[in-house]
Amino acid sequence: MNLPTKITVLRLVLTVILIILLCFPFYDVGIQFPTYNVLGGISLQYIIAGVIFIVASLTDFVDGYLARKNNQITDTGKMLDAIADKALVNSVLIILAGQNMISAIIPVIVVLRDIVVNAIKMEAAGKGKVVAAIGSGKLKTATLMVGTTLALFCNAPFEHWGIYVDDILLFVACILSIISAVQYFNINKELIFPKKAK
């Protein structure tokens, strides 16, 4: 296993830690996180989760950079990278929606988009074609990561001024999700629905 793949695996491990941190009933077992009354009040639980999410998100850029720089791009690495990306962002979005910290429509749109795009990629792979990433998809991922980070930090410092930057970014990411899904379909529609020879 090369270094970029190890970094990708680290992202998966951090995702599991995040899920446990956000879902485990610490209060029920006598563990209570302090809340810091700074810019609206943030629980230490979410501060830690936010820091872990930032580190995990950065590994997404680091593993790709190292793989390209050192010519260590492998099929296993690409597969794990895609799984790690979806697991990190989608799991946190679903948890935050379940805790009423973000709108439930956000993970619904993002997850449905991923299902559609993955179906297109699988269809293409079955016909020997690799579907390249597109600009709107990359922008969607970056916007999602920033918006999710802000949501974990309870929209600080913008919450203090009543500006819901986390919600704005996440809804922009939803729009980009839809746009990128449509673009993926348009680019690959002839592959999905080949024209029959007359």
Region roles according to the model:
Residues 1-198:
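Alpha-helical transmembrane bundles and membrane-interface segments of multipass inner-membrane proteins
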